[in-house]
């Protein structure tokens, strides 16, 4: 992989301005000691989403047991135990924010016997009990390919089950050394074949993959029962992370979208700043 590129192209320059509900969203999250992937993963869309009064809740703390080389989330072999109040605090925040579509995600917790699956279950149940009309999108980890743990979450029947394959097979060992491409695809397949869930996945580009490799991964997703996909530009969080190989042009993102739709993926979002949960409500089953 090449060294990090010195200058971002114009299409990757954001005008940052906090307005609207930004301050209220930040205060609400801080008061309830809630983590968001928006902040922990250094998402470029944080100000836009928080200003619209939306956020993606990060379960099981903000310390991950894995060291994926693209991710800004902090790591440790044994993070603090999960906050038992988190499910109710998230449910309360959803109610106060008056959300219609809620995105939940989590760090990997390989230190826990069930990978945090029961905590996921409690959170989903708490959110629905307090907000019966809300739709849930769950962006889940792989639970170390433990079917029993995975099924605890799938059995709660979220309206959208999201699991990102993240990248193509040829660089998986570099990007996600503690994960497995086939295992991630099989999560999508199990959610579809055994639970008939609406499924979603995501890819980052600009890490050394080729156009044809991305197209093949889109084929793989379709063959494993994926309904929706997001494709976005990888941005290096720090000097210790994988360097950006190239900046993918908006035109190439449009090509990915065209290919994905031609393969039968019914909801596709493809662009430089696209992230898994960005404008997730517009990719929900009702849209």
Curated annotation (Swiss-Prot):
Mostly located where? cytoplasm
Q: Matching InterPro entries, A to Z?
A: Aldolase_TIM, Elp3/MiaA/NifB-like_rSAM, Lipoyl_synth, rSAM
A GO cellular component term found in this entry reads:
cytoplasm
Residues where [4Fe-4S] cluster 1 binds: 38, 43, 49, 277
Any one GO molecular function term: lipoate synthase activity
List cystine links.
Answer: none
Residues annotated as binding [4Fe-4S] cluster 2 are 64, 68, 71
Cofactor(s) listed in the protein's UniProt record: [4Fe-4S] cluster
Q: What is its EC number?
A: 2.8.1.8
Q: Which reaction does it catalyse?
A: [[Fe-S] cluster scaffold protein carrying a second [4Fe-4S](2+) cluster] + N(6)-octanoyl-L-lysyl-[protein] + 2 oxidized [2Fe-2S]-[ferredoxin] + 2 S-adenosyl-L-methionine + 4 H(+) = [[Fe-S] cluster scaffold protein] + N(6)-[(R)-dihydrolipoyl]-L-lysyl-[protein] + 4 Fe(3+) + 2 hydrogen sulfide + 2 5'-deoxyadenosine + 2 L-methionine + 2 reduced [2Fe-2S]-[ferredoxin]
Answer whether the UniProt record assigns the keyword Transport to this protein. no
Q: Where in the cell is it found?
A: Cytoplasm
Protein's pathway:
Protein modification; protein lipoylation via endogenous pathway; protein N(6)-(lipoyl)lysine from octanoyl-[acyl-carrier-protein]: step 2/2
Indicate yes or no for the key word S-adenosyl-L-methionine: yes
The UniProt entry, under HAMAP family, shows: Lipoyl_synth (MF_00206)
UniProt protein name? Lipoyl synthase
Q: Which organism is it from?
A: Chlorobium phaeobacteroides (strain DSM 266 / SMG 266 / 2430)
């Amino acid at each position: 992989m090449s060294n990090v590129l010195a200058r971002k192209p114009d299409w990757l320059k954001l005008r940052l301005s906090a307005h609207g509900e930004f301050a209220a969203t930040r205060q609400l999250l801080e008061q309830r000691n809630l983590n968001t992937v928006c902040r922990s993963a250094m998402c470029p869309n944080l100000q836009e989403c928080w200003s619209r009064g939306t956020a993606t809740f990060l379960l099981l703390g903000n310390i991950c047991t894995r060291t994926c080389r693209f991710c800004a989330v902090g790591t440790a072999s044994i993070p603090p135990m999960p906050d038992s109040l988190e499910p109710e605090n998230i449910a309360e925040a959803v109610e106060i924010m008056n959300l219609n579509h809620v995105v939940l995600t989590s760090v990997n917790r390989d230190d826990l016997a069930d990978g945090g699956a029961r905590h996921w279950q409690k959170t989903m149940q708490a959110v629905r009990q307090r907000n019966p009309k809300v739709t849930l999108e769950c962006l889940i980890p792989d639970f170390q390919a433990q079917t029993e743990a995975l099924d605890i979450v799938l059995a709660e029947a979220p309206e959208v089950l999201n699991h990102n394959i993240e990248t193509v097979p040829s660089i998986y060992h570099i990007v996600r050394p503690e994960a497995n491409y086939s295992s991630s695809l099989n999560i999508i397949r199990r959610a579809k074949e055994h639970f008939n869930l609406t499924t979603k996945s995501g890819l980052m580009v600009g890490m050394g993959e080729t156009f044809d490799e991305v197209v093949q991964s889109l084929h793989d997703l379709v063959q494993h029962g994926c309904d929706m996909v997001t494709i976005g530009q990888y941005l290096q969080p720090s000097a210790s992370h994988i360097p950006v190989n190239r900046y993918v042009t908006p035109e190439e993102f449009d090509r990915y979208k065209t290919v994905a739709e031609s393969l039968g993926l019914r909801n596709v979002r493809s662009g430089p700043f696209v992230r898994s949960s960005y404008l997730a409500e517009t990719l929900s089953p009702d849209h």
